């Protein structure tokens, strides 16, 4: 097995020029796997249970059913209106939206919508939560960009 040790310096030099976009303004993804249930700031913790007919295990691929449709997740940030919009088709019962100060201004009223349903507090003021920050840093291991708030559709 070749180690490609002579390429490591080239790879590291290439990586210096790349920056991770922690918070893209929008994203659109599709999934057929129950464990692919989190994308950037959107998580669907019970995706496999909510939509068993839309999920397929890789060992069963290609799916035997022609009715199998991927779950589509789209989200956009509107910084001028302090709004986060999430659209999931087909709809799932439980969606979590994680927020950071890079996404919304916690000092102003904000709106968070999942499938056109408001999930933010009635007064629009979203309060950061230290427990969410610590748990997120622990589970994701990203101590530089932890999520500050989680809003749930349940």
Go through each PLM region and give its residues.
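Alpha/beta-hydrolase-fold serine-hydrolase catalytic core, especially in secreted/extracellular enzymes
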Residues: 1-154
